Every structure is written in C-alpha cells, then in structure tokens.
Amino acid sequence: MLAGPSGAGKSRLAARLHAAYGWPVVRLDDFYRGGDDPELPTRDLGGTTIVDWDDPGSWNAAAAVRALEDLVAAGTTEVPVYDIARSAAAGTARISAPPGSLVVAEGIFAAEIIGALADAGILHSAWCVRHPRWVTFGRRLVRDLAERRKAPLVLLRRGLALTRAEPEVVARMERLGATCAGPAEVERRLRTTRPSTNQTSTNPHTRERGSG
C-alpha cells in the first residue's frame, strides 16, 4: 500500500515496482466519485466554491476495498479508469494478479483503507511516500499543469494549500498505520520483505496475494 501526499512520487514508485518485479498496480485514484455526484464535499478557494478533491469523501473507499479483496481472492478484478480532467470515469480495466505476487495499491487516500485491508487479512505493508514538502509542491504543479488537470490558477492555489496542510496530512496517514519513508527506502524494504512464491508469510496481515 503506497499512500502519501499528492505529487510525492507514489505512481512513479509503483511503476518501478511493476517493471522490476511484475507486481500488478491498482491506481486507487481511479475510484474518485464523478463530478456530478451531489454528495461531493466542497471548499472555498479564493472566494470560489469548488469540489474538494482532497477530502476522502470525494473518493469511493468501499469500492476500492471490494476491488482489492476480489483481486486477492480470485486473482482478477475490474477497476474504473478515471479521467481527472473530466472528473468522471472514462471506462474500466481488468487487472490480474498471479499467485505469489504482491499487489501495489497506490493513491492519495490509500491510508483510509489500511484498517479495512488489515481486517480482511490482505495487507502486506502500508507506506507514506514523501519528500520535502516544497519538492512535492514543485513536482505536483509541473505534473498537473502538463496533464491539464484543472485550470492553472486552481492548480496553483490548490498546490499552495496542500503544501501548507502537508504536515497534518502526513501525521494523519501515520495515525492510520502508514510508515513514512522516501521512495528508495520503500522499494528497498519491499524488495527484502516480499513473500516467496513457495511459502506463505508469517505476517498475520499477509497472504501470498497481498496488497503492498
């Protein structure tokens, strides 16, 4: 499980883990609710009311947990493919996990389901990926502008707000059970603790197909 602030490098780390070990990746940000959902949380940003996409209420935690449980139990699951620029799902994709493989689940709200996955017995480990917060600010802004996720002024204001709030956000992830570390350290720890295909881990929260 890879949690962490927006722009911290979760997706890049997940891609490296997939390339190195073949572990399937579940993008938890694809479980955002649609922009037309009347229950979406809102916030004031410079006198303008906008959807608060940084509130866990904008995300479908129950659907994410079900997908991960199905993937571990059956070796396959269907997940949405979310278009952030349109604030809507653009389709679906099927993900498969071979026996003995870890599953890398990554997203800004990943920490919200640590407890549920541990209770289900499918949590291998949970990490809060982080950099110095102004490094994260710069990486996030460059990415969001390049992908045209929202209007530039909205992205700048949101980025500054997230940077100010980052210490509190990281502390919350730690309270929910995530261990904070840089991407290289997380990769090293996962490499040395990944389950063998020939034996089941003794960790009570791990199965051979566990969510990393």
Identify the role of each PLM range.
Residues 10:
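Conserved lysine of the Walker
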Residues 90-149:
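ATP-dependent NMP and nucleoside kinases share a basic, alpha-helical "lid"
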Residues 13, 17:
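Hydrophobic positions on the alpha1 helix immediately C-terminal to the Walker A/P-loop
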